């Protein structure tokens, strides 16, 4: 006997005809964190030549495009997100010639290269900032400056605004005799997008890399780009308190109503998309794309797609699953979050699915190692774009790093009691290629972050040889995405009670595919005839994980599918 509770709302999402589907609309995107992917020169830090050497691996796992975290010239205060030369390659990663060789090899393998673009700020070592601090007329207003306010004879920052990296958003510059704004690190001064020259300068940076051969950009930290306009006297209001937080240095101490998600932000995204369209017209070939990072309310995110008049980001990252799913989430929660995106997405747009990135705890650590395959089934089985962070395909997990060895500035600016809550180092450790020294990442005596202690058990070489390893399950799921049903079929998503997430992909004239995920530790018996319509009496197992006693091509009756604890499978009609 079993309970069958079906979420009432099933979604039938009509997708465009196959002829209308561009390369990215059903693409597999893969994030590379260059410092940690592959070290070719033995300095303990990954580089462009290392990435080029390993591009065949991306081809092996079916990747369509890879976006690289920043590779530009930087003093590395925030590991490349503090850019000093927006048109240069940092020597730690290689040379412009190395980048061009990477582009050429990627083209041979039909893999698109996407670059990380950081619009909110530059490094304080950027020539623009140096000139702005010196008061040069051309660059005087490239950044956000204010002389502050004097209280009881003491000069203070102009507002109470708190940085993402703790402490005041304002730092005093002796040369300029003024405070400059930095929403992040003090070495990351914010650009002033209310100056049209800044907008044009950044659009020119986009053009430069697109003409080099990049196929688009992942745009970093978009909600922070604009602050509320200053009043007639050039001043801004303080932000209100968040009464739930007592630490005045912590970013969450304030409600950031004046420093995030300002309406002009969307207009800037649309302007960046205009550049994409301009270069598409100039160079031709496959479409170039924008991916935007914003942990913003859903109603704001949907506007990133465009407003009916202007085109926006083709791929505004969907962080519903990444940010809101927890270890204790039930199937209803998974289904609700999937529906949140699909039900609110503007007509004609493309969904995307993300479970990991370089800022968030890895799937296996956050949700449990026995849910890794399930999460990959979700991102690779639902319609639209899948996004995988390096190592998630083989089940890499977070690495504990001591306070003494922590290098992430977000954590280093805290203290020994707080750093573990803030550090991103555990998800950025070297990629695990093999059971050789340093997991095959580097032959250096010391790597920039320590290698995971489990690398001899979890690595590409070992998992290639295990039939139901995370890597091989991922590759099977990826191969299945080439089926017409998964490229252009409808989708229905539901929870079958609290433990089982189910979704069906269907297309007239082709097999239907049903994904079943047992999130918890109960044995479940499912009558799919009462869940989905138009399925055959018997179903065939197409993909199984290592919790299953079934094997590929086994048959089962639709009215009595047995799911073991944490089992995740894909079935097809026969």
UniProtKB/Swiss-Prot annotation:
Q: Which sites does the entry annotate for glycosylation?
A: 120, 307, 443
Question: Which CDD domains does the record associate with it?
Answer: AmyAc_maltase
Could you name the domain of life of the organism this protein comes from?
Eukaryota
Q: Where are the catalytic residues?
A: 220, 293
The signal peptide here is: 1-19
Q: Which UniProt keywords apply?
A: Glycoprotein, Glycosidase, Hydrolase, Signal
What is the taxonomic lineage of the source species? Eukaryota, Metazoa, Ecdysozoa, Arthropoda, Hexapoda
Pfam short name (any one): Alpha-amylase
Can you state which reaction this protein catalyses? Answer: Hydrolysis of terminal, non-reducing (1->4)-linked alpha-D-glucose residues with release of alpha-D-glucose
Site annotation (Transition state stabilizer) points to 359
Which family is annotated?
Belongs to the glycosyl hydrolase 13 family.
Enzyme type, top EC level: hydrolase
Disulfides per UniProt: none
Naturally occurring in which organism (per UniProt): Drosophila melanogaster
Gene3D superfamilies per the UniProt record, alphabetical: Glycosidases (3.20.20.80), Oligo-1,6-glucosidase, Domain 2 (3.90.400.10)
Q: Which GO terms describe its biological process?
A: carbohydrate metabolic process
What is the E.C. number?
3.2.1.20
Official protein name in the record: Maltase A3
Q: Which GO terms describe its molecular function?
A: alpha-1,4-glucosidase activity
User: What gene name does this entry carry?
Assistant: Mal-A3
């Amino acid at each position: 006997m079993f309970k069958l509770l079906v979420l009432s709302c099933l979604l039938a999402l009509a997708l465009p005809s196959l002829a209308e589907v561009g390369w990215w609309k059903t693409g597999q995107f893969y994030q590379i964190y260059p410092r940690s992917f592959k070290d070719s020169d033995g300095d303990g830090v990954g580089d462009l030549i290392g990435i080029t050497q390993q591009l065949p691996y991306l081809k092996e796992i079916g990747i369509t495009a890879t976006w690289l975290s920043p590779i530009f010239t930087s003093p590395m205060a925030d590991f490349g997100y503090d850019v000093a030369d927006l048109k240069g390659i940092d020597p730690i990663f290689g040379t412009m010639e190395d980048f061009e060789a990477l582009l050429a090899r990627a083209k041979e393998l039909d893999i698109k290269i996407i670059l990380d673009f950081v619009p909110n700020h530059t490094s304080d070592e950027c020539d623009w900032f140096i000139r702005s601090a010196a008061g040069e007329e051309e660059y005087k207003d490239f950044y956000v400056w204010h002389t502050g306010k004097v209280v009881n004879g003491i000069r203070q920052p102009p507002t109470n605004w708190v940085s993402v990296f703790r402490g005041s958003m304002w730092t005093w510059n002796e040369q300029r005799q003024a405070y400059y704004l930095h929403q992040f690190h003090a070495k990351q001064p914010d650009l002033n997008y209310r100056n049209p020259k800044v907008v044009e300068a950044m659009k020119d940076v986009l053009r430069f890399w697109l003409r080099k051969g990049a196929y688009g950009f992942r745009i970093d930290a978009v909600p922070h780009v604009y602050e509320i306009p200053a009043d007639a006297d050039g001043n801004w209001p303080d932000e209100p308190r968040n009464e739930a937080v007592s630490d005045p240095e912590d970013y969450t101490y304030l409600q950031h109503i004046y420093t995030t998600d300002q309406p002009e932000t969307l207009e800037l995204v649309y302007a960046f998309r205009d550049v994409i369209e301009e270069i598409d017209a100039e160079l031709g070939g496959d479409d170039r794309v924008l991916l935007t990072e914003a942990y913003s309310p859903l109603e704001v995110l949907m506007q990133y797609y465009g407003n009916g008049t202007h085109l926006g980001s083709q791929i505004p990252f969907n962080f519903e699953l990444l940010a809101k799913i927890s270890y204790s989430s039930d199937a209803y929660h998974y289904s609700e979050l999937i529906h949140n995106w699909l039900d609110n997405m503007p007509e004609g747009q493309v969904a995307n699915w993300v479970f990991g990135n370089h800022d968030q705890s890895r799937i296996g650590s956050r949700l449990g190692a026995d849910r890794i395959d399930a999460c990959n089934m979700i991102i690779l089985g639902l319609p639209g774009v899948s996004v995988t962070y390096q190592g998630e395909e083989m089940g890499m997990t977070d690495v504990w790093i001591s306070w003494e060895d922590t290098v992430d500035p977000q954590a280093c600016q805290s203290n020994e009691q707080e750093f573990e809550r803030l550090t991103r180092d555990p998800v950025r450790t070297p990629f695990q290629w093999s059971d050789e020294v340093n997991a095959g990442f580097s032959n250096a005596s010391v790597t920039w972050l320590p290698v995971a202690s489990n690398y001899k058990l979890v690595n590409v070489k070992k998992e290639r040889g295990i039939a139901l390893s995370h890597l091989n399950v991922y590759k099977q799921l990826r191969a299945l995405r080439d089926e017409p049903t998964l490229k252009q079929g409808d989708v229905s998503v539901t929870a079958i009670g609290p433990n089982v997430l189910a979704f069906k992909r269907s297309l007239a004239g082709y097999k239907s595919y049903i994904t079943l995920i047992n999130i918890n530790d109960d044995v479940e018996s499912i009558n799919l005839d009462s869940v989905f319509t138009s399925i055959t009496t018997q179903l065939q197992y197409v993909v199984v994980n290592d919790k299953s006693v079934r094997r590929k091509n086994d048959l089962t009756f639709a009215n009595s599918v047995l799911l073991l604890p944490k089992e995740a499978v894909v079935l097809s009609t026969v």
